[in-house]
Design a protein with these regions (language model features):
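Soluble cytosolic regulatory domains appended to membrane proteins
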Residues: 2-160
Length: 160
């Protein structure tokens, strides 16, 4: 058969293999999704800023933990003066561990004292490239910024 010359040939080969029962449906879909991801930008997959959950930096550990647990997310952006000023990421496990180990910290310490650095990515970045970077650097959540540096949204490795 020789080498495949382009993406279309590989897609056709996968379709043929699927039709003949050589490739499972989920594998077939995954291969097609890989090709489609190559043309996809981060802005198309992100959670837009209007749908984001965040914690204000001056909230107590108890308040931050309560909000994060109610949201169902394990990582939540922490904002300073507003949504365009993200100062880090709060991990529920960090907040919970601190609150359990030091009960007084629940009400005396602020969320901003327990944030991890945020990763920022441009909204016009290719999703496939970001996926590789997130996998390589073990990043689960990134802040998506628009061309003016404002917060456009967030993206998780699961979104990609």
């Amino acid at each position: 058969m020789g080498l495949l010359s382009d993406e279309d040939e590989l897609r056709q080969l996968m379709d043929h293999a699927h039709t003949r029962g050589l490739v499972e449906s989920d594998e077939h879909e995954m291969i097609h999704n890989v090709f489609e991801l190559g043309d996809t930008l981060v802005r198309e997959l992100m959670v837009p800023r209007t749908d984001m959950v965040w914690i204000e930096k001056d909230k107590t550990l108890r308040q931050g933990l309560s909000l994060a647990l109610r949201s169902g997310y394990s990582r939540v952006p922490v904002v300073g003066d507003g949504i365009d000023n993200i100062i880090g990421i709060a991990y529920v496990k960090d907040l919970a561990k601190r609150a359990l180990d030091h009960h007084e910290a629940e009400t005396t310490e602020k969320v901003e004292q327990h944030t991890r650095p945020a990763v920022f990515v441009p909204e016009n970045k290719e999703a496939a490239e970001l996926l590789k970077e997130m996998q390589r650097d073990q990043i689960h959540l990134a802040i998506v910024v628009d061309e003016y540096g404002g917060t456009a949204g967030i993206i998780t490795i699961e979104d990609i």
